[in-house]
Amino acid sequence: MDIQWYQPTATSHSYEPFADLVMDEYSRLLPAPNRFPSSADGKGFAPLAEYVHSLGLKFGIHIMRGIPRQAVFMNAKIKDSKYTARQVAQYNNICYWNPDMYGTDTNCPGAADYYNSIFELYASWGVDFVKVDDICRNYNNEGEIKLIRNAIDNCGRDMVLSLSPGPARIEQAEFLKENANMWRITDDFWDKWELLYDMFTRAETWCNHAGAGHWPDCDMLPIGPINQDYSKDNRSAFTHDEQQTMMSLWCMVRSPLIIGGEMNGFDDFTMSLLTNEELLNIERDTHCAHMVTRKVVDGNEQIIWLAPAKDASVNYVALFNAGESVCDITVDIARLGIKPTNAYDIWNFTTEAVGDKLTATVNPHGVRLFKLL
C-alpha cells in the first residue's frame, strides 16, 4: 500500500499540504475509510491484509518517518506514554517534498513510545513489509532508524524493513545491515539510460554487502505501463535490450525485485523478464557477485560481471555493452579460475561448447548472460 493511504482527499501523485488526515487519539495514522471501506470502525488494514494473505501473498505499507504534524498541532496523546506529540516532534526536521510529518526528537523517550505504538498497530493489522520513506539518504536519521528497528523487534511480528530514498552512504553499510533489511542505493529510478548506466557504479560499490537479511536496493523495475494513468500506450522508455540489462544487473547484485509497472498491461516480453527461471536462480542462489572488468574497446564500454552459485556448482557471467554500437565481448574464462564445458545463454535459451574464452556479440546497451556449466 503506497504513500498517503491515510489521506481521504488524495486524488493524484501530488501532495495536498496540511490536509485533514485520518488519525486515532494516539497520533497514529489510519487508512481513510472512504478509500478503503474495509478499514472502517477501527479495523484498519486488518481485513485487507487477511485477504492478501489468503492469496498466499505478503502485505506491505508505506509510511513517512516521524510523527504527524496534525498530531503535533492538536498536541495529541501517544499510547502508553506520558509524553505528547508536541514533546516528541522536532520542528526543524521535516521532509522537503511531503508535508505530513515532523521528525522525532530521538533523545525524548516519547519518540520510542510513539514508534512502538505504531508498529504495535501494524502488527495487529498483519503487516509483513514496511517501507519507511525520507530516512535513508539523510546523514542524521540513524537515531530514528534505530527506534524503528527496536519497535519492529518488539512488536511481536516479523516485518521486512525497507529504507528509502537513496542514495544511502557506503560509510553506513554496516549500520544499515544491522538495522534494516533493504535500503535504497539510489534516488528514484526511472526508465532513462543515464540512470541505468550510473547503476553499474552503484552496484560495484554495494555488491559485497548483499547477504541473508540485508539487501542493497536498486529501486523499482520501470517495466510495462509506468506513467501515472497506466495507459498501455505509456510503456517503459527502455528498449528491450536495456530492460534485459537492468534485470541482469539487478539479479547479479541480488537487489530486491520490485515491479514498478501496471501488471494488467504487461505484454509477453515484459512477462518474460519476470518469469525467466535461470535468471531468477541468479537472484536466489548466488553469492559474492562482482565486476570482473570494465574497459573501453573500440569506442564501446564493456562491463563483465561474475556470480558464483552458493554451492559452487555453476557460475554466471554477464557481458554488458554500455556503448552505442554492436560489439563483440570476450571473457577469459581460464583467468577466472573456473573450467566450464558449456555456456547456456539465459536470454536466448541456447547452449554452446566453451573453452578457455567465451565471445559473444552484444547489442548497444544490451547484455549476454550465460550460465557456465
Where in the sequence are the language-model features?
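Active-site-proximal beta-strand/loop segments in catalytic clefts of secreted hydrolases
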Residues: 1-4, 62-67, 132-136, 161-167, ...
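Aromatic-lined carbohydrate-binding/catalytic grooves of carbohydrate-active enzymes
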Residues: 1-51, 55-123, 127-134, 138
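Glycan-recognition surfaces
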Residues: 88-93, 105-107, 113, 154, ...
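Extracytoplasmic, non-cytosolic globular domains
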Residues: 121-167
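Carbohydrate-binding surface patches
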Residues: 244, 250-253, 258-260, 297-337, ...
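Catalytic cores of secreted or luminal carbohydrate-active enzymes
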Residues: 245-294
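Solvent-exposed beta-hairpin/edge-strand motifs
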Residues: 334-349
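C-terminal beta-strand-rich structural cap/linker in extracellular carbohydrate-active enzymes
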Residues: 354-373
